[in-house]
């Protein structure tokens, strides 16, 4: 087992990475506020791992669970209320601990419920998708979507621990594996050229779910994210580089309807647009751009926007992105591989031409 630490002073917490961790009570017990626990999961994960986690937590005096519908389209205030309804009906108090057993949607919603219930209770992240293991479970971003924009309602609220059992990836659908690899690739592009080069060599091993390759990719990804979040917990500065491709990607998700493209697919196509814009601006060498696009494609991710999405649709959704400052669009772009910047200082004409060139059908 590997253990990382996200250093946030009093809000610091461990990130455990290894196999069969769901069966280890010692990883959970120190992080429970009391013997009250509510496990939040979804209809896909519950048949696979809920009983296993409940057995691990069988020493708890009060152990309840709630099973949410699966999918980004259910990341809403209405479904969030299901968690609150269960907490209240089962008389959980402010000493309870919520455990998020699932992917990014479950983790984001459980964290937001924990931030809100009785003005804040503890929670633990147990991510079951590659994307949530390397990204959404670490860093304290929680929330739900709004019809006009992704993650528009939420809070920064840190977990007590993140327990990453790599063995659960054995049951992950191939599409979700590729989606998670989008976030893994992102870390190499924005901050770590040796890791990017390692990914170029080891993508076949990752797609084949070789355990050592996956564990290494997860550890490096979490270490990069932990390092960035430790410097900028509330995303007022450098943390925004973790959103490479996300402004374009969130626009795709909002336009298509949540759930049509999974998040990692939208981020993959978004990173291609971000790299191509960086190249057209003269900030990223064309060969480096080609390498990034090739790696994204090798992971089985889309490299083009969805057919029928217009440049105007992109601009309309990007205008409400959370990085917009004083009415100005800011993007995460590349000044070379391994060097991401957050900037609004780019030629908008170049962006508009890129979207015209890439938006087809």
UniProtKB/Swiss-Prot annotation:
Q: Does the keyword S-adenosyl-L-methionine apply?
A: no
Q: What does this protein do?
A: Catalyzes the conversion of 3-deoxy-D-arabino-heptulosonate 7-phosphate (DAHP) to dehydroquinate (DHQ).
Compartments where located? Cytoplasm
Task: Supply one GO molecular-function term.
Answer: metal ion binding
Q: Per its UniProt record, what Pfam families does this chain match?
A: DHQ_synthase, DHQS_C
Disulfide bridge positions per record? none
Name the pathway. Answer: Metabolic intermediate biosynthesis; chorismate biosynthesis; chorismate from D-erythrose 4-phosphate and phosphoenolpyruvate: step 2/7
Q: Which residues bind NAD(+)?
A: 70-75, 104-108, 128-129, 141, 150
Q: Which CDD domains match?
A: DHQS
SUPFAM superfamilies recorded: Dehydroquinate synthase-like (SSF56796)
Task: Kindly provide the name given to this protein in its UniProt entry.
Answer: 3-dehydroquinate synthase
Q: Tell me the InterPro entries matching this sequence.
A: Dehydroquinate_synthase, DHQ_synth_AroB, DHQ_synth_fam, DHQS/DOIS_N, DHQS_C
Cofactor annotation = Co(2+); Zn(2+); NAD(+)
Q: Which organism is it from?
A: Teredinibacter turnerae (strain ATCC 39867 / T7901)
Q: What are the top taxonomic ranks of the organism?
A: Bacteria, Pseudomonadati, Pseudomonadota, Gammaproteobacteria, Cellvibrionales
Residue numbers binding Zn(2+)? 183, 246, 263
């Amino acid at each position: 087992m590997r253990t990382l630490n996200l250093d946030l002073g009093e809000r610091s917490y461990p990130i455990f990475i290894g196999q069969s961790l769901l069966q280890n009570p010692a990883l959970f017990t120190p992080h429970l506020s009391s013997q009250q626990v509510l496990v939040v999961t979804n209809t896909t994960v519950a048949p696979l791992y809920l009983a296993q986690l409940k057995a691990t937590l069988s020493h708890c005096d009060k152990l309840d669970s709630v099973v949410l519908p699966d999918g980004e389209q259910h990341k809403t205030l209405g479904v969030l209320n299901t968690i609150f309804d269960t907490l209240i009906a089962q008389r959980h108090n402010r000493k309870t601990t919520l455990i998020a057993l699932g992917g990014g949607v479950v983790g984001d919603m459980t964290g937001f419920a924990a931030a809100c219930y009785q003005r804040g209770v503890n929670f633990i992240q147990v991510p079951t998708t590659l994307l949530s293991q390397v990204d959404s479970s670490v860093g304290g971003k929680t929330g739900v979507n709004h019809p006009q924009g992704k993650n528009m309602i939420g809070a920064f609220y840190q977990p007590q621990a993140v327990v990453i059992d790599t063995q659960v990836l054995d049951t992950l659908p191939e599409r979700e594996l590729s989606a998670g690899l989008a976030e893994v690739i992102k870390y190499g592009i924005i901050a770590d050229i040796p890791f990017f080069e390692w990914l170029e060599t080891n993508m076949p091993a990752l797609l084949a779910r070789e355990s050592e390759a996956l564990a290494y990719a997860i550890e490096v990804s979490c270490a990069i994210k932990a390092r960035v979040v430790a410097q900028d917990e509330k995303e007022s500065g450098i943390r925004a580089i973790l959103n490479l491709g996300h402004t374009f990607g969130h626009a795709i998700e909002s336009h298509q309807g949540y759930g049509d493209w999974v998040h990692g697919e939208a981020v993959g196509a978004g990173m291609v647009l971000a790299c191509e814009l960086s190249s057209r601006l003269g900030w990223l060498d064309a060969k480096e751009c080609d390498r990034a696009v090739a790696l994204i494609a090798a992971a089985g991710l889309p490299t083009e926007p969805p057919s029928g999405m217009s440049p105007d649709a992109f601009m309309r959704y990007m205008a409400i992105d959370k990085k917009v400052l004083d009415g100005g669009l800011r993007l995460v772009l590349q000044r070379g591989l391994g060097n991401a910047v957050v900037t609004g200082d780019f030629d908008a004409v170049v962006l508009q031409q890129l979207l015209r060139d890439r938006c087809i059908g």
